[in-house]
Amino acid sequence: MSTLDFNKIGKSYQSVRVLEGIDLQVTAGSRTAIVGPSGSGKTTLLRIIAGFETPDSGKVILQGNPLFDQSTHVPAHKRGIGFVPQDGALFPHFTAAGNIAYGLKGSKQDKARRIDKLMEMVALDRRLAQLWPHEISGGQQQRVALARALGQRPALMLLVEPFSTLDTALRASTRKAVAELLSQANIASILVTHDQSEALSFADQVAVMRAGKLVHVGAPQELYLRPIDEPTATFLGETLILSPNIEPGWPDCALGRVKVDDATRQGQTRIMLRPEQVTITPLPSAHHYPTHCLAKIVSIDFAGFISTLTLSIIEHNEIVAIKTISREGIHVGLMVDLTIMGQAHIFVE
């Protein structure tokens, strides 16, 4: 059963069309990530779901009840939707407990018990309850904001870049904790982010937006390995795009013969590999002939864990750049053997 249904949502600001024909379903307890470049319309879409913006056309339905259609517009505060903004937006004049209590109903004792339960749910130390927002860390502030949103028992949780202000290590652990918490509570969630890796790791469903349209919606691994087009492929991660001539059998390209995910295609086309599909094996000497593809390292861009190797493919006299895990023994001038793992993805023209 779907928690949220979007049907043909459109939105314009004066003559500028920012959303066009948006169809999207979010199932109960699932996690959806909406990604796209700046100006693609993802924030506007989330604001429409929350009730902060009104679409020009279409329908928004939550648990079978219309939030917006030609005759209905439910205001934001009556939608039963939780909202966690980028910076948490905690009330600075309330303690952590006071922020969590905001909007809770019941007696003082009931609220206190509910605050304790919510702090436990988001793994917040009870000793933080009486601290002010500026006295706790960024990760703790985001957990307070999440607890405050959970206190309303929402059917749907909206998360706007909620981890972007955290440092790298804290971002990963907080993201995992939030994902697990929402799943355990069976609360559907929508994350808006510009971080592709964050979207892929958080979500069960990823929706890629471009120029006000949803261009590809599906499971993270499906979108990553079989994107609908080249712009989507490059947006979701590093790519190696090649132009082989496909004949009966495996196509031949700069990296040798490559297995593809659509063997029925023939003729000139473009294929995609992800960098992790290319295994780079150093050769003891230039006279050791590989069984796959011989290349020479012509430059190295070292960036810590990852390095970008610029390679000259000997047989085809072509240059390719491949990102790989940094390791000792790799240097300019080294001859290497390139082996492709798995299938290349063919783009449909």
UniProtKB/Swiss-Prot annotation:
One of its GO terms (molecular function) is ABC-type ferric iron transporter activity. Gene3D superfamilies: 2.40.50.450, P-loop containing nucleotide triphosphate hydrolases. One of its GO terms (cellular component) is plasma membrane. InterPro entries: AAA+_ATPase, ABC_SmlMolc_Importer, ABC_transporter-like_ATP-bd, ABC_transporter-like_CS, ABC_transpr_FbpC, P-loop_NTPase. ATP binds at residues 36-43. It is an enzyme of class 7 (translocase). Residues 4-236 form the ABC transporter domain. SUPFAM superfamilies: P-loop containing nucleoside triphosphate hydrolases (SSF52540). Belongs to the ABC transporter superfamily. Fe(3+) ion importer (TC 3.A.1.10) family. PANTHER family: SPERMIDINE/PUTRESCINE IMPORT ATP-BINDING PROTEIN POTA, SPERMIDINE_PUTRESCINE IMPORT ATP-BINDING PROTEIN POTA. The complex is composed of two ATP-binding proteins (FbpC), two transmembrane proteins (FbpB) and a solute-binding protein (FbpA). Part of the ABC transporter complex FbpABC involved in Fe(3+) ions import. Responsible for energy coupling to the transport system. This is Fe(3+) ions import ATP-binding protein FbpC. It comes from Yersinia enterocolitica.
